[in-house]
């Protein structure tokens, strides 16, 4: 059984079979809502089936829900190279295709809310659409020097390097494993804050450890956070209101939470808010997710423990005071100039300054709550229901759905209910 995901407020979840069935379940009370057999997976021609599958992911189908509506986005990831380039918006209740979009490269991921649909291709491009009419609004090329210019990162070095060097960097990135390919996430609210990680380049290496914050509603850049980890960013999440992003390192031992700067300009001055240690042993982080009011962060990996971190004032990092004689930090005037004219030379001045990093005044904190996984060979995803703030949902690709109660104090979550959907 393929494992897809919860909807934006964890009231429902969607699963896909290894064949062509897409099913939506209600979480509480538990029950099947809709089921659709997608005829597009049948009678696949030989020409369509040939070719490498570079779309990434473990599931045959990529399915993204739009809250509790009948609309879902569907991508066939392993039904041939042609189908992996095609996105369908489907009314699963009526079993009709609303629209169908074709792209030049396989689709890596799809995220959407009530205003925007964002599509990530494995060619490192992001396409932004107006969901009301599916009009194409903007394309972001993660490798494009324009993205670097918008965010103020290395404009001159990229421009002077020439096309051949850019092509070389793209080819070098294609050797990466699928687990460290670019990630995208979109806030649930109508402000539609988009976050994605991008490449930090040098003459010897290409690392996916920078994060861009983009206003997908107004099609404008908001922030650029460089070197959020020493290595690649393995997982990325944004809070429902778009105020915070969470990142996990490729090693899987550290989880960090930053201000996106979407709320106020002053937030950009000290972007790092929280830093947690997941564990000492390496782990592949598959999912990070915030609860509805951004007070909890769930972390799911391939270890035997699901971690839940508490985001409160006691866990927040304290910044060291900046030396008054040191003018190398970013000021609010810099940020105002950045947003007023994103093509000005202010970017060079801005990026040349040393960002004063937040330094923790205490040892890194551990999780507030945890869930022990009995079968580590199965894949799990986590959901925080908005309706029931003291509960946590866990979905397993062996066909099990668990409801846990959060502890009042630090400790283990208590299993309160289990359902099967095989």
Curated annotation (Swiss-Prot):
Signal peptide: none annotated. WD repeats lie at residues 1-35, 102-153, 166-206, 228-268, 280-319, 374-414. InterPro entries: PROPPIN, WD40/YVTN_repeat-like_dom_sf, WD40_repeat_dom_sf, WD40_rpt. Coiled coil: none annotated. Transmembrane segments: none annotated. A motif (L/FRRG motif) lies at residues 276-280. GO terms for molecular function: phosphatidylinositol-3,5-bisphosphate binding; phosphatidylinositol-3-phosphate binding; phosphatidylinositol-4-phosphate binding. GO terms for cellular component: cytosol; endosome; fungal-type vacuole membrane; phagophore assembly site. It is found in: Cytoplasm; Membrane; Vacuole membrane. Keywords: Autophagy, Cytoplasm, Membrane, Protein transport, Repeat, Transport, Vacuole, WD repeat. It holds the Pfam family PROPPIN. PANTHER family: WD-REPEAT PROTEIN INTERACTING WITH PHOSPHOINOSIDES WIPI -RELATED. Required for cytoplasm to vacuole transport (Cvt) vesicles formation and mitophagy. Involved in binding of phosphatidylethanolamine to ATG8 and in recruitment of ATG8 and ATG5 to the pre-autophagosomal structure. Protects ATG8 from ARG4-mediated cleavage. Contains a beta-propeller domain involved in specific binding to phosphatidylinositol 3,5-bisphosphate (PIP2). The L/FRRG motif is essential for the cytoplasm to vacuole transport (Cvt) pathway and for the recruitment of ATG8 and ATG16 to the PAS in nutrient-rich medium and in both its recruitment to and dissociation from the PAS under starvation conditions. Belongs to the WD repeat PROPPIN family. This is Autophagy-related protein 21. It comes from Vanderwaltozyma polyspora (strain ATCC 22028 / DSM 70294 / BCRC 21397 / CBS 2163 / NBRC 10782 / NRRL Y-8283 / UCD 57-17) (Kluyveromyces polysporus). The lineage of its organism: Eukaryota, Fungi, Dikarya, Ascomycota, Saccharomycotina.
């Amino acid at each position: 059984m393929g494992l897809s995901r919860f909807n934006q407020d964890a009231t429902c979840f969607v699963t896909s079979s290894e064949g062509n069935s897409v099913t939506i379940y209600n979480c509480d009370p538990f029950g099947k809502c809709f089921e659709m057999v997608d005829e597009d997976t049948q009678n696949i021609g030989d020409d369509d089936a040939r070719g490498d599958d570079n779309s990434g992911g473990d599931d045959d189908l990529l399915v993204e829900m739009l809250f509790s509506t009948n609309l879902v986005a569907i991508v066939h990831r392993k039904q041939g190279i042609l189908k992996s380039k095609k996105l369908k918006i489907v009314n699963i209740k009526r079993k009709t295709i609303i629209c169908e979009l074709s792209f030049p490269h396989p689709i890596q991921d799809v995220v959407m809310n009530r205003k925007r649909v964002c599509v990530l291709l494995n060619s490192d491009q992001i396409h932004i659409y107006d969901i009301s009419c599916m009009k194409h609004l903007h394309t972001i090329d993660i490798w494009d020097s324009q993205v670097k210019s918008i965010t103020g990162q290395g404009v001159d070095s990229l421009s002077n390097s020439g096309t051949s060097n850019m092509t070389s960097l793209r080819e070098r990135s294609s050797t990466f494993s699928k687990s460290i390919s670019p990630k995208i996430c979109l806030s649930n609210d109508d402000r539609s804050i988009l976050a994605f990680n991008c490449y930090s380049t040098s003459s010897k290496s290409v690392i996916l450890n920078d994060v861009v914050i983009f206003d997908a509603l107004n099609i404008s850049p908001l922030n650029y956070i460089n070197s959020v980890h020493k290595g690649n960013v393995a997982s990325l999440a944004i809070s429902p209101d778009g105020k915070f992003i969470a990142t996990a390192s490729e090693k899987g031992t550290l989880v960090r939470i930053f201000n996106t700067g979407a709320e106020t300009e002053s937030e950009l001055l000290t972007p790092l808010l929280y830093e947690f240690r997941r564990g000492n042993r390496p782990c592949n982080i598959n999912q990070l997710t915030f609860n509805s009011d951004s007070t909890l962060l769930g972390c799911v990996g391939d270890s035997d423990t699901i971690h839940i971190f508490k985001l409160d004032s006691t866990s927040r990092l304290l910044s060291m005071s900046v030396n008054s004689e040191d003018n190398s930090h970013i000021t609010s005037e810099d940020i105002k100039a950045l947003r007023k004219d994103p093509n000005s030379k202010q970017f060079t001045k801005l990026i040349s300054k040393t960002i004063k990093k937040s330094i923790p005044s205490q040892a890194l904190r551990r999780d507030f709550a945890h869930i022990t996984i009995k079968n580590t060979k199965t894949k799990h995803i986590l959901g925080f229901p908005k309706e029931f703030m003291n509960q946590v949902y866990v979905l397993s690709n062996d066909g099990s759905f668990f409801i846990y109660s959060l502890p009042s104090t630090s400790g283990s979550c208590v299993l309160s209910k289990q359902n099967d959907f095989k």
